[in-house]
A protein has these predicted regions:
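Non-heme Fe(II) oxygenase metal-center motifs and adjacent flexible, charged/small-residue loops
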Residues: 1-224
Length: 224
């Protein structure tokens, strides 16, 4: 747990463990990631809206490495079509480590970071994400979040409940957001997508793609 504690207070006032780096991805990088998304969304496990307590989410999700469904990770998408999700690519590990380095983590923390799953969410203009914690992972390693397309209002809260104190910030196309250490279990959500705010050349004309990299802490003998 202590390995991934970040003690610096970032200048944006989000508190220890959280960092927002605007325009971290270039337009070329964003466009390339959108091209990858077009491949991922087709399958072998196609993009879908997960159901939480019987209610379908407004965002649609496709996964790499491990398949996420509430409230577990499996290799096979037993809630979709029973197929195994694509492997987690090596370039995403390198991307995640570069994100941590740029967010202020130490060299030791960066080298120990080995994400093994990506949750890729697509938000249409009316989609939302309620306040929640990312706590289905065994590992306490940081979450790396990338935004592409339309900007959104991202609400980043506290670790105790969904209420105040929280901070609303705008995540634009190309932005990086990292949260770990004391902020790892902070409640967070998306209250609004801002239509027609995607920059020309990012590869996405409408909606928002959010890619989150995580370390599950899972092994194959602990999965379906």
């Amino acid at each position: 747990l202590t390995l991934f504690t970040l003690d610096i207070d970032p200048p944006d006032g989000l508190g220890p463990g959280a960092a927002h780096l605007p325009a971290w991805l270039s337009l070329d990088q964003q466009r390339w990631l959108v091209e990858q998304f077009r491949v991922w969304e087709r399958g072998p496990v196609p993009i879908r809206a997960a159901k939480v307590r019987g209610h379908e989410m407004s965002v649609r999700t496709v996964c790499l490495g491990w398949h996420w469904q509430p409230y577990q990770y499996t290799r096979r998408a037993t809630d979709v079509n029973g197929e195994e999700v694509p492997p987690f690519p090596d370039w995403m590990v390198r991307l995640g480590r570069r994100a941590l380095a740029d967010a202020g983590y130490t060299a030791e923390q960066v080298s120990a970071y080995t994400p093994d799953t990506a949750l890729v969410n697509f938000y249409h203009r009316d989609a939302r994400m309620g306040m929640h914690q990312d706590k289905d992972e065994i590992s306490s390693a940081p979450v790396v979040s990338l935004s592409i397309g339309d900007a959104c209002t991202f609400r980043f809260g506290n670790v105790e409940n969904r209420s105040r104190p929280y901070t609303d910030l705008r995540l634009a196309s190309g932005d990086l957001f990292v949260f770990g250490g004391p902020a790892r279990l902070a409640f967070h959500g998306v209250t609004r997508v801002h239509p027609s705010t995607a920059p020309d050349g990012c590869g996405l004309d409408d909606g928002r793609i959010n890619i989150t990299l995580r370390m599950t802490g899972m092994t194959d003998d602990r999965s379906d």
